[in-house]
């Protein structure tokens, strides 16, 4: 640990390398934890590459898995994954701020300029304030999401398992990770007719997708006219792609009997809305993706690419 500490805080090691090394270390430790027999329900050793892929996906909130998380991993293993999702969801700059706050180190000019440009602040005081706001907002929104989801999960799974499901999926949605522990390998397909679950997850995904800088701007300005250009562009783009995406999916899948063709109009709109919100980044599914039309798959690619350019 002393060697790691010296490496992380060596004066010649720049901040980007420190954070990169920190994330790599977290991913590796997470993989080793998932390999332990206690992490699997069958109490078997998970192959290293499978564990490493899962922890990398969780930390980078991509949502890709080689293993059915809900069916394979135990409560301990799921908790490790959830911790990594939360850590990854906080983001690069937030972790950077926390590192400086905890270590009580002064930020150099180069790092100060990097943080100022990214966060829109020029002082360490502003950075500390933003980091605290990020932690508070994240905790509050994820808690509210878990409470709403518990309305469905607790009656179905019992109090403790239901609350765990609620917390896990709330955090996963808010961090745009897309991990689920339903256990049937079909993501949210079993809740495709449940507006409470789908809308709650979609709202969490949308709010989380705005980013911390936009939240801080909204909290500080409290008025649309006073928001900076960056915040307005992100908010309007989010609304645009959700609305247009919903409409496009609704049209393209309207007559597809393998997806929403046999559903009522209301259920078609709900499924199209959820697909539009989650396709861009979150990865939750309420439809079987292989059954989508080719045009819908192409549109999904457009939505995912749009995230890169915003």
Residue ranges, per PLM feature:
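Membrane-proximal intracellular helices of multi-pass ion channels
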Residues: 1-308
């Amino acid at each position: 640990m002393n060697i790691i500490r010296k490496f992380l805080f060596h004066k010649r090691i720049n901040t980007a390398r420190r954070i990169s090394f920190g994330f790599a270390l977290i991913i590796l430790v997470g993989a080793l934890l998932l390999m332990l027999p206690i992490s699997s329900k069958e109490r078997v050793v998970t192959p290293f590459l499978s564990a490493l892929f899962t922890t990398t996906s969780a930390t980078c909130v991509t949502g890709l898995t080689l293993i059915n998380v809900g069916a394979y991993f135990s409560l301990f293993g799921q908790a490790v994954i959830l911790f990594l999702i939360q850590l990854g969801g906080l983001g690069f700059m937030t972790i950077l701020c926390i590192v400086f706050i905890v270590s009580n180190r002064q930020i150099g000019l180069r790092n100060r300029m990097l943080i100022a440009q990214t966060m829109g602040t020029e002082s360490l005081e502003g950075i500390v304030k933003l980091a605290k706001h990020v932690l508070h907002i994240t905790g509050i929104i994820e808690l509210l999401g878990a409470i709403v989801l518990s309305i469905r999960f607790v009656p179905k799974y019992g109090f403790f398992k239901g609350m765990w499901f609620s917390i896990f999926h709330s955090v996963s949605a808010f961090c745009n990770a897309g991990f689920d522990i339903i256990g049937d390998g079909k993501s949210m397909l079993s809740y495709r007719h449940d507006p409470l679950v789908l809308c709650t997850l979609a709202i969490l995904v949308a709010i989380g997708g705005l980013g911390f800088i936009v939240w801080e701007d909204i909290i500080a300005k409290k008025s649309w006219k006073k928001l900076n250009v960056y915040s307005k562009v992100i908010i309007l783009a989010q609304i645009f792609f959700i609305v247009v995406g919903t409409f496009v999916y609704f049209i393209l899948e309207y007559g597809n009997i393998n997806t929403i063709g046999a559903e009522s109009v209301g259920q078609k709109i709900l499924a199209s809305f959820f697909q539009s919100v989650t396709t861009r980044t979150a990865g939750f599914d309420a439809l079987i993706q292989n059954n989508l039309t080719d045009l819908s798959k192409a549109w999904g690619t457009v939505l995912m690419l749009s995230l890169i350019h915003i």
